[in-house]
Amino acid sequence: MSKVRLVVVGNGMVGHRFIEELIERADPGRYEITVFGAEPRPAYDRVHLSSYFSHHTSEDLSLVKPGFYDKHGIRLLLGEAVKKIDRSNREVHSNKGTVVEYDKLVLATGSYPWVPPIQGSQHHECFVYRTIEDLKAIRSAAKSGKSGVVIGGGLLGLEAAGALKALGLETHVVEFAPVLMAEQLEGDEEISAEDV
C-alpha cells in the first residue's frame, strides 16, 4: 500500500498539534507528510509571545522538540507561504515556487490580525503583534521611539501595551468599546485605564 500524501498548510500551534496527534494515532508509515510554514521558524507558543520581551528566546517558545520532523520523516518547508491550491490537480503551490501534490489536505492557517483601515496604518513603524518577527521589529523601533499607541484594549492589546511600557515607551491604549477587555469580561465587571 502506498503512503497517503498529506499536506498541512500552517505550522502554528494548531497545525503542529495536529501533526503530533496524527503521529500518535496513525499507523506508522501511513502518511508522507509535508508541512508549509510561512514563518522562518517551526511552531512556537503564541500564547506566551509577550515573554519574548522579558529575555525569553524564540527557542524558549518553541513547541518543537529538536529532531522531531526528521525523526518522523516530515518535510518541513519554512518561510514558504502557500499562494495557490489547485484542487483539480491536487497540488499546493508556494510563494517560492514549490509544488507539492496531495491526497489529503489540512488547512491550519490560524488567524490574522485585523488592522483598522485608518490613515497611517501601512506606515513602516505601524506593527501588528502576532509573530516573533513582529516583536523583533517592535523592539527595534522602540530603541529610537519615545511613545507607542496600541489599538485594541482586549487581552492581547493589553499585553502589547505592557510590552511597550517594559521597553520604556510612554504607552497609550485606544479601545473602541467603553471599557477595556470588553470581550473577556461580563456584565458588571469592568476595567478602566486607571486600573491598568
Task: Give the positions of each predicted feature.
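Active-site phosphate/pyrophosphate- and oxyanion-stabilizing loops and adjacent acidic/basic residues
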Residues: 20, 136, 195
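Beta1-alpha1 glycine-rich phosphate/pyrophosphate-binding loop at the start
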Residues: 2-75, 163-188
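N-terminal Rossmann-fold NAD(P) dinucleotide-binding loop
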Residues: 15, 157-158
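Short, conserved glycine- and acidic-residue-centered signature motifs
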Residues: 128-131, 157, 186
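Extracellular/periplasmic Venus flytrap/periplasmic-binding protein
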Residues: 186-196
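Glycine-rich Rossmann-fold phosphate-binding loop(s) that bind the pyrophosphate
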Residues: 10-13, 130, 151-154
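FAD-binding core/adjacent interface of flavoenzyme oxidoreductases
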Residues: 1-7, 64-149, 172
